[in-house]
């Protein structure tokens, strides 16, 4: 059962709440969140579409077979540009399983257009063999079809 306490301006969920979006203004407290993830027995290669309306975390469990480009979008029919407003940011992660020959994320796109991320330390030039590469991206919308991306690569062996 959900209730709204007018005096405290609080929306209290005692069991569950289902909705398309929750817009909260001001400071919020969360005990915990569960992010939607997609786990796929797919090998990273070519251009990988990361659908932000589908997941916050994408995990490819088959060994990467080539360097890849990640393309961030809303989904196959909705642009990321259309679901974000200027001043918003989106944080996502892409996990890639590496075999004995490692590969890496060599390019980033948003809605099919190339962007130049600001990488922590430096852009990756390799992966790590027999590991899981974790790529984190924070995407800032700075204007119409204008984005700044900061990114990092970590390897878990």
Task: Give each language-model segment a name.
Residues 55-60:
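Short carbohydrate-recognition loop motifs
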Residues 1-54:
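Intrinsic low-complexity, repeat-rich intrinsically disordered segments enriched
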Residues 63-157:
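Acidic, glycine/polar-enriched metal-coordinating patches/loops
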